[in-house]
Each structure stands twice: as structure tokens, then as C-alpha cells.
């Protein structure tokens, strides 16, 4: 798995996806992770799991006033999501990430400078916020993530209201 993570989150793959231009549909095509929404759960006690998940998701969406959970994923050690840009789901977003030991990262290409930025996970909960643009907008954000420990991501989209997005960030961080 580690070789796959390095391959699909590496520089060669980044350039391959970027060079595809609009031929890339925006979604990640390579990952090692597990969807954690109830409709993907195959474990014991599915009713209890579903109820717990719905309560958590409802609490977050009501508290933040958001409507859409874009991604809810658990990455195992050596898990990853390969380079992609979410041009198929353009919106302001808030991304909560929990990391078991802080041995993961989120990388993105700054759409203005083309610099590759790495945000190292810290142990526990982390918050990232950004905007994933559509093709032609000047703010398409290519990104990937990788971890060597358990890592969970809960991502919510907020539409295209920048002021509301900023208010949410202020609320969460105050």
C-alpha cells in the first residue's frame, strides 16, 4: 500500500492530473480509504451506527448551518487520496480532520503561485477551509492527502457565499 500512496500522491501523478486539464472530471480516481457514512457501513449493529452517525452529522450541519456533507472518510495507516481538484463540486468548504498521531498531510497546488503547499496534520482535530473552483475560474485547487496513521476527514460544502464561509470559520475558531 505504501508504494501506491507514494505513487498517487507524488509529483509525477500531480503533473499527470494537472496536464489532463478539463479532461480530468475533478474526482479522485485512486485512494485507499473507507467511506464512513451509514450507507457504506457493513459492520455489526448497523442501526446503532446509523443513529450515531446521523446524530453527529445533524449536530454539525445544524451548528454550522451547512447542508451537504461532501466527504466522510477513514484513512488507515498508509491510506491516501490521490491528486484531484473537485472542479466537479465547486464550493467553499470546511474540512475537519482527525489524526491519530499527526503522521499525515494534505498537499495542494496554490492556484495563484503554483507552489505546492504541504499542511502537516497535528495529532487530534485539525481544521482546513478553502474554495474549490471550477475550470476557467482561476481557482482550481489540485490536492491530495496521505497518512501513516489513522486519519478521518469530515468535509462540508457551503456553496459560494464567501462571507458566510468566513463567518463559519470565525465561529469554529473562536
What are these regions (language model features)?
Residues 136-153:
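Ligand-binding loop in jelly-roll beta-barrel domains
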Residues 1-64:
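Non-heme Fe(II)/2-oxoglutarate
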Residues 8-12, 25, 113-124, 146-148:
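Exposed regions on extracellular, virion, or secretory-pathway luminal proteins
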Residues 58-65, 99-103, 161-163:
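Secondary-structure boundary elements
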